[in-house]
Design a protein with these regions (language model features):
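Short solvent-exposed coil/turn linkers within tandem alpha-helical repeat scaffolds
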Residues: 96-97, 186-189, 262-263
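Residue-level recognition of tetratricopeptide repeat
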Residues: 100, 145, 188-190, 229
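Alpha-solenoid helical repeat architecture
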Residues: 227-233
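Long, ordered, amphipathic alpha-helical scaffolds
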Residues: 236-286
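C-terminal motif of bacterial Sec signal peptides marking the signal peptidase cleavage site
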Residues: 42-45
């Protein structure tokens, strides 16, 4: 009888030990499972947060690559599709490095070229507006350099002459930017600021300050800096023709046709020389 009692007690204790062991094993599995799930969630959350943000140095280096690509595309600007790709590259550079002055003023320059060569009215208007915005950004970034002021003023001038959007620019806006360029660098772009000021006087109605004689005066100031500037000679010839100085106009036009063009400005030279020949033929016909 006592043996049966001892046997039952042993069985109970054995059951308790087995139950406890099983319970501990279960707890251990639960803990391991919980830890595994926790690690999985942590890893997933790390992946969802995305890659670490690039450092400012990395952003600047990447923006510099975009600038290099943009310059290469601008060299093919005769193909407006390549020019548009260059504009995209400059926008990317500014997104990566918002304080990049070179990207800002070049974006203004590229948009000006697109606006003055596109046959699509909406694209032209949009490009002038984008050029003005980029020029303003450049001026805000480095007000003491001429590039931003010049291309802002150029886009103001183009918008005033061509754009169907009213209120983008006034004669005073153009004049103020070009006068700022002259204070900072009188010979900038081979006297181009004098040329733009002259065009303001040449093309503006008299009621807002247009005056062909003043146009001649302004453009002549650019001649000491503008010997290789085909467009300066062309527009000065136009001003001479308007005030009846045909011999002086012929002289400027022949300078264009006889000059050796800068390889970096072949598209501009081709345009200027074609217009020069047309004006020369017109003057010769009387």
């Amino acid at each position: 009888m006592e043996n049966d009692k001892n046997s039952q007690q042993f069985s109970n204790e054995s059951f308790k030990r087995s139950y406890l062991a099983a319970h501990l094993i279960g707890m251990r599995r639960y803990i391991i499972c919980a830890l595994s799930i926790g690690l999985l969630v942590f890893a997933t959350s790390c992946n969802e947060s995305g890659p670490p943000a690039e450092s400012p140095v990395a952003n600047s280096a990447s923006a510099a690559e975009d600038l290099t690509q943009a310059d290469q595309l601008y060299a093919q600007r005769n193909d407006l599709m390549q020019l548009r790709r260059g504009i995209v590259a400059l926008r990317q550079a500014l997104t990566k490095d918002p304080g990049n002055y070179e990207a800002a003023w070049k974006l203004s320059k590229f948009n000006y070229y697109l606006a003055t060569h596109s046959d699509i009215t909406q694209e032209r208007d949009d490009a002038f507006k984008a050029g003005i915005d980029a020029g303003k950004t450049a001026v805000q970034l480095q007000n003491d350099k001429p590039d931003g002021h010049f291309w802002l003023g150029a886009n103001y001038g183009g918008a005033a002459e061509h754009s169907t959007i009213q209120g983008l620019a006034t004669v005073n806006d153009i004049r103020n930017e070009m006068e700022t360029v002259l204070r900072l660098d009188q010979g900038y772009q081979n006297g181009s600021a004098y040329m733009v000021l002259g065009l303001v006087y040449l093309n503006a109605p008299g009621i807002v300050g247009g005056d062909p004689k003043k146009a001649v005066e302004e453009m002549e100031k650019g001649l000491p800096f503008g010997e290789p500037n085909a467009f300066l000679h062309l527009h000065l010839a136009e001003a001479y023709e308007k005030v009846g100085r045909n011999e002086d106009a012929r002289r400027e036009l022949k300078k264009i046709l006889d000059m050796t063009p800068d390889p970096n400005y072949l598209p501009e030279y081709k345009e200027a020389s074609a217009d020069a020949q047309k004006l020369l033929d017109q003057i010769d016909r009387g």
